[in-house]
C-alpha cells in the first residue's frame, strides 16, 4: 500500500509540474510578444494597451459554441461597464427577439380600438404600384384613421417593398428618411411591408435599414428570422396582382376521382450557380415526361451562356414544348421549389388553379402560418428528399386529394386573391394578437367563410354565427323575429302593414314582432296596433334612414330575422314555409321577391332587371329571412360611403345586403314558390314611399349596382335557377296530403 501511495504522489506532482510548465510557457510567450510590440510601439511613439491583453484568451476556442445573442467583440467590450453591457444586450433583445409583449404598446389600442394610420405620402418620393395598392387597401378599410393620435398601428408611406439594391424600385437613403419621422419612436407599433430583401449573391433578409421595434409583414421570410407572434409572413405577389376583388379559383366543379392529366408539374428557371440552384438543378432526376413533368430553362440573366452545362440545350428544348397554363390547369399537384429567395410566384398560381402545392423550400415560414393550417391545403416536402416526392404524392388517397383541392380554393378566395385581402388578413391577425379575449380560433380561419367575414366582436361563441351549425352539431334556430319597416303614417285599420303584422304573428315560429318606425309622423297610439299572441315592439328610428333597418338592434332576440316591407302581402302559410326552407340554408337569404343582374355590353356596365326570367341573383329583403349576424356585418363591415349612398338615395339597401351575403357565402340566395311578390310600381302614389313609382327609382338601382361592384372589386352576385316549392306542390293528389295547401290558392 505504501508503494502505491508513493507512486500516486509522484504521478500527481508530475502532472502539476507539467501544467505549470505549459501555462508558464504560454504566459512567457505572450510576455515576449508583448515586449516586442512595446518596443515597436515605443519606436513609433504609440501608446500600448492595458496589461489585461497579456493574458491568454481561452474562450476563443469556445467561440463557435457561444449563443448568437451573447457573441460580442471582446476587444471592444473589455472596458465597457456592466450597465453598457446590459444596454447592448437589451438592444439586441428588442431587435432580434421582439414579441408583442416586449415591443408593442397596447395602451394605444385600448383607448380607441384597433385603428391604423398611414403616413401621408411625401412629395418627390417614388412609390411602386404594388405599395400604392397596399396603402389604398389600408385607407379603404374600416381600421383606417387619418388622426395619428387615434392610431394603434402605423404604416410608412415610404416604399419598403423592394429592398434589392439592384432593383429600379429600390428607395435610397431610407435609413435617414425613416429616422426623421416624428412618430417613428424606434419603430414601436409600426408595421413594415416587404416583398424583396437582399441581393446577389446571398440574398439575405436584411431590409437595408434599422427597423427598430417595428413588425415585419414580409414575403420569403425564413423560420430562423421569423419572430413568432410578432412578424407576419405574407405571400410573394406580382405587380399585376389585383388591388381588390380578384378572380375566383379555377375549380368550377368537383371531379371524382380528382385526378388530372398530370400528377406533378413545374415550369421555371434553372439556376446554374448560387443560392437556390441545388434543388432546381436536380429536378431532372424526377422528370419522366409523362405524368411527372418538371421543366427548367437556363435562358435567364445576361450571362447564362457562361455558366451553361451539358444539359442546358436539352432542357431548353424540352421547356419550349409545353404551355405553362395548360400544365397548371391539368395537374393534380404543382411543385413549388424555392428560387433565389424562399418564396415563389408559383405558390399563388397553384392555389388559384386548384393545383395542390407541393412545397419544396426548407425553412420558409409559410404565409399567414400563424392562423392557416397548411397541412389541409398543401404537401410540405423536404428539399433533401426530392427523389421521394413522386412516391409520396402517389400514396395520397383520392378523398384527401379532393379535400386538399377544395381547401386551396377556399384559401385563395378568402385571403390571397387580391392585395386588399392580403393586407386585411395581416391587420386582422395583428388585431387578434392585441385583443386575445375575442380573437378568432383556428376553425374560423380555416373554414368557410374565413376570418375576414367572421367578426369576433359580434360574439365569441361559434354557435351565434350561421356557418358552424354542422361543425358544432347544432340545429338552426326554431323561432324568428319579424322586423317590419314602416315609412307611412297609420291612418286606416285596413292598411297592408296591419294585415301583415297579424299574418306574421300567427306563425307558429314567430317569437316577436318589431316595427321599425321610420315615418316622419309621430308614433301611433298603442291601441291602434292589433292584438297579437306575440309581443309587438315599436322602435322609432333615430336617423330615419334606409340603412337603419339593418342595424343590430338588441331587441332582436332570435338569430333568424324575417325582414318585411310595410306593403308586403304574405299569408301565414307562406311565412311558415319560407322559414322552414331557411332552416336548411341558415347562411343564405331565403324569400319571395327575386331580381337579377346582367352585363350590358352596349353600355359596358352592370344592369338590374325585375323581369320574370328563368334565373335570379337577388332576393329582396322586403320579404325575406336571413340570419341576424348580417345586420352586424352590414353595419360594421361595409364602408360608410356605401351606406351614406343608400341613405341619400333612400334606395338600394336591399341590393347592398344581397351583395354582402353573396360575397360572404359565395352562393346565390334562394327563392321560394313561384309567387311574384310586389313589383317596383306596386306602392301607392299617396304614400311618402311612392319611391317605387318614381321613374328615377329604377335608374338609381342601376347606378347602385355598379357602385357596389366597384367597391367589392368584382361582381359577387351569383345566378341561380333553383326555386323551392312545397312537396306535392300542384301535384294531382288530394289536397289533404299537402302540408302547405294554402300556397296553391294564392
UniProtKB/Swiss-Prot annotation:
E.C. code: 2.4.1.225
Processing and modification events after translation: N-glycosylated.
Metal-binding recorded as keyword: yes
Enzyme class: transferase
Matches recorded under InterPro entries: Exostosin, Exostosin_GT47, GT64_dom, Nucleotide-diphossugar_trans
Entry keyword Ribonucleoprotein: no
Name of protein: Exostosin-1
Gene name tied to this protein: EXT1
Amino acid at each position: 500500500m505504501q508503494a502505491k501511495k508513493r507512486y500516486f504522489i509522484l504521478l500527481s506532482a508530475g502532472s502539476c509540474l507539467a501544467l505549470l510548465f505549459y501555462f508558464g510557457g504560454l504566459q512567457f510567450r505572450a510576455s515576449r510578444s508583448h515586449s516586442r510590440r512595446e518596443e515597436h510601439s515605443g519606436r513609433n511613439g504609440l501608446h500600448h494597451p492595458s496589461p489585461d491583453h497579456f493574458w491568454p484568451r481561452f474562450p476563443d476556442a469556445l467561440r463557435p459554441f457561444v449563443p448568437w445573442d451573447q457573441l460580442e467583440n471582446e476587444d471592444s467590450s473589455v472596458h465597457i461597464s456592466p450597465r453598457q453591457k446590459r444596454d447592448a444586450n437589451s438592444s439586441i433583445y428588442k431587435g432580434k427577439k421582439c414579441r408583442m409583449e416586449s415591443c408593442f404598446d397596447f395602451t394605444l389600442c385600448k383607448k380607441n380600438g384597433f385603428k391604423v394610420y398611414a403616413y401621408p405620402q411625401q412629395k418627390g418620393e417614388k412609390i411602386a404600384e404594388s405599395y400604392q395598392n397596399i396603402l389604398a387597401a389600408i385607407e379603404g378599410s374600416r381600421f383606417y384613421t387619418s388622426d395619428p393620435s387615434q392610431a394603434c398601428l402605423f404604416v410608412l408611406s415610404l416604399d419598403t417593398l423592394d429592398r434589392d439594391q439592384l432593383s429600379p424600385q429600390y428607395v435610397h437613403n431610407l435609413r435617414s428618411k425613416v429616422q426623421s419621422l416624428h412618430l417613428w419612436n424606434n419603430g414601436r407599433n409600426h408595421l413594415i411591408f416587404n416583398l424583396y430583401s437582399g441581393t446577389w449573391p446571398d440574398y439575405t433578409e436584411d431590409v437595408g435599414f434599422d427597423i427598430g421595434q417595428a413588425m415585419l409583414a414580409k414575403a420569403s421570410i425564413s423560420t430562423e428570422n421569423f419572430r413568432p407572434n410578432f412578424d407576419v409572413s405574407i405571400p410573394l405577389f406580382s405587380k399585376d396582382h389585383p388591388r381588390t376583388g380578384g378572380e375566383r379559383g379555377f375549380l368550377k366543379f368537383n371531379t371524382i376521382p380528382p385526378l388530372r392529366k398530370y400528377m406533378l408539374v413545374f415550369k421555371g428557371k434553372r439556376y446554374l450557380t448560387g443560392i437556390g440552384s441545388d434543388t432546381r438543378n436536380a429536378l431532372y432526376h424526377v422528370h419522366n415526361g409523362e405524368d411527372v413533368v418538371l421543366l427548367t430553362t437556363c435562358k435567364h440573366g445576361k450571362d447564362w451562356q457562361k455558366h451553361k452545362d451539358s444539359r442546358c440545350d436539352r432542357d431548353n428544348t424540352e421547356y419550349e414544348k409545353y404551355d405553362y397554363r395548360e400544365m397548371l390547369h391539368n395537374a393534380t399537384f404543382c411543385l413549388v421549389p424555392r428560387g433565389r429567395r424562399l418564396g415563389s410566384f408559383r405558390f399563388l398560381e397553384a392555389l388559384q388553379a386548384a393545383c395542390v402545392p407541393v412545397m419544396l423550400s426548407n425553412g420558409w415560414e409559410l404565409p399567414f402560418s400563424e392562423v392557416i393550417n397548411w397541412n389541409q391545403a398543401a404537401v410540405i416536402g423536404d428539399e433533401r428528399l426530392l427523389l421521394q416526392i413522386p412516391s409520396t404524392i402517389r400514396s395520397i388517397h383520392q378523398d384527401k386529394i379532393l379535400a386538399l383541392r377544395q381547401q386551396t380554393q377556399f384559401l385563395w378566395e378568402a385571403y390571397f386573391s387580391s392585395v386588399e385581402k392580403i393586407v386585411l388578413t395581416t391587420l386582422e391577425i395583428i388585431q387578434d394578437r392585441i385583443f386575445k379575449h375575442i380573437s378568432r380560433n383556428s376553425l374560423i380561419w380555416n373554414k368557410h367563410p374565413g376570418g375576414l367575414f367572421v367578426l369576433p366582436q359580434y360574439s365569441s361563441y361559434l354557435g351565434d354565427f350561421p356557418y358552424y351549425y354542422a361543425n358544432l352539431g347544432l340545429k338552426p334556430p326554431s323561432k324568428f323575429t319579424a322586423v317590419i319597416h314602416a315609412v307611412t303614417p297609420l291612418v286606416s285599420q285596413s292598411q297592408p302593414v296591419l294585415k301583415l303584422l297579424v299574418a306574421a304573428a300567427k306563425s307558429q315560429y314567430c317569437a316577436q314582432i318589431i316595427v321599425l318606425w321610420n315615418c316622419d309622423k309621430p308614433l301611433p297610439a298603442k291601441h291602434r296596433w292589433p292584438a297579437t299572441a306575440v309581443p309587438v315592439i315599436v322602435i322609432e328610428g333615430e336617423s330615419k334612414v334606409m340603412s337603419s333597418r339593418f342595424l343590430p338592434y338588441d331587441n332582436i332576440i332570435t338569430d333568424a330575422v324575417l325582414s318585411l316591407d310595410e306593403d308586403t302581402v304574405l299569408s301565414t302559410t307562406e311565412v311558415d314555409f319560407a322559414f322552414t326552407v331557411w332552416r336548411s340554408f341558415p347562411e343564405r337569404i331565403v324569400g319571395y321577391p327575386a331580381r337579377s343582374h346582367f352585363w350590358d355590353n352596349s353600355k359596358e356596365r352592370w344592369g338590374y332587371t325585375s323581369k320574370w326570367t328563368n334565373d335570379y341573383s337577388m332576393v329582396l329583403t322586403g320579404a325575406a329571412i336571413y340570419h341576424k349576424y348580417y345586420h352586424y356585418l352590414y353595419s360594421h363591415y361595409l364602408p360608410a360611403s356605401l351606406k351614406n349612398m343608400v341613405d341619400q338615395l333612400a334606395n338600394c339597401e336591399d341590393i347592398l345586403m344581397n351583395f354582402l351575403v353573396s360575397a360572404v357565402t359565395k352562393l346565390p340566395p334562394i327563392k321560394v314558390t313561384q309567387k311574384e311578390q310586389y313589383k317596383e310600381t306596386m306602392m301607392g302614389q299617396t304614400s311618402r314611399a311612392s319611391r317605387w313609382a318614381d321613374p328615377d327609382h329604377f335608374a338609381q338601382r342601376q347606378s347602385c349596382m355598379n357602385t357596389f361592384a366597384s367597391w367589392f372589386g368584382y361582381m359577387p352576385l351569383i345566378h341561380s335557377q333553383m326555386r323551392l316549392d312545397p312537396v306535392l306542390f300542384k301535384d294531382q293528389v288530394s289536397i289533404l296530403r299537402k302540408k302547405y295547401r294554402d300556397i296553391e290558392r294564392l
